């Protein structure tokens, strides 16, 4: 596997879609949708999902990645992505909880305006992700193994990402459980500026899986 070509492909597949949606940004905002829209989010999420599976396959790890918007049997929460034991053959994108290795929250843009709802970063993060972390901790007790809850955003405001990363690392009890590709403010200006290089994504994934 040529890592550089995969990293370039990840960006090259997504950036043209961002530019296309950016040209229609006004229309999307008129419809009260976030910049990027669900369409763009789906394109990026599918690309990221394939990117993760390619890394897993290259290193012969015994895991598979669910399709987007998957469920864990007996759990009411819809997860953006689930990484599970490769031997499992899930039905209807529903995963056996005993086979789950990690769950992932994916955001096209991880930038949030704190003043919009007059909440602090900490309050927003707890209200947004607290229930999911409680669910993960409950599942861990039932299946008797660690399940990490990871966060990935394609673009983000740097300050917001730092707060998000600190929150996820604290609740996972380990470092490096959140990852951001691009600077959201620069992306709005049409500039492609990395927050963390694509090469660092492998380290993030291995850490999430406990395979460092």
Language model: regions and residue ranges:
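Intrinsically disordered, low-complexity Ser/Thr/Pro/Gly-rich regulatory segments
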Residues: 1-212
